[in-house]
């Protein structure tokens, strides 16, 4: 299945129940690869996608959230923000652009580094939602979990240089929720 971007956006809903059908590796690989094509500040690529299929890890994610879809989905994506100053910019950007970007990151305190990394991680998460929909998969983006428990579940316990952007349950839908509706317009031109 392949949808246009507009179709994937229009059809995407939060789905919390899934069939038992496993997600083929090639489809999951495409979703993750497309998610990681998301733009990031300075192209610093300060987000990782942890692909969770192991039931024990999914059980730990459920314990961190009490959200059954994280336990029951065939796969869960944990979008992790690299909340420290990047060290690989010369390899990613070349020396001149890396020097400029490093100057920016050097001016940030720990809270600002975390905030900018989380913004990048949320871009990756949004791309993952649309990429999954385009492949015929349903998703449930979640918040409301204990971040330290999520980090522990994916092997990053005690790391203050990592943060969780979003935890996304994913699988083939066992339900088709109706469109929940939207306000007539949230668009604001120029200023409030």
PLM-predicted stretches and their roles:
Residues 1-192:
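Acidic, surface-exposed loops and disordered segments
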């Amino acid at each position: 299945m392949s949808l246009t971007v507009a179709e994937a956006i229009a059809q995407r809903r939060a789905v919390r129940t899934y069939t038992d059908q496993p997600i083929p590796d090639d489809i999951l690989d495409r979703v993750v690869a497309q998610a990681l094509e998301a733009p990031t500040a300075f192209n610093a690529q300060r987000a990782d996608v942890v692909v969770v299929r192991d039931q024990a890890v999914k059980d730990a994610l459920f314990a961190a959230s009490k959200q059954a879809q994280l336990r029951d989905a065939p796969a869960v994506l944990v979008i992790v923000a690299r909340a420290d100053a990047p060290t690989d910019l010369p390899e990613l950007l070349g020396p001149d652009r890396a020097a400029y970007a490093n100057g920016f990151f050097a001016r940030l305190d720990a809270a600002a580094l975390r905030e900018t990394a989380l913004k990048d991680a949320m871009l990756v998460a949004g791309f993952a939602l649309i990429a999954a929909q385009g492949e015929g998969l349903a998703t449930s983006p979640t918040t409301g979990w204990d971040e330290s428990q999520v980090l522990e579940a994916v092997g990053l316990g005690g790391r203050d240089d990592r943060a969780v952007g979003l935890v996304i349950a994913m699988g083939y839908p066992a339900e088709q929720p109706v469109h929940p509706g939207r306000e007539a317009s949230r668009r604001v031109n120029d200023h409030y």
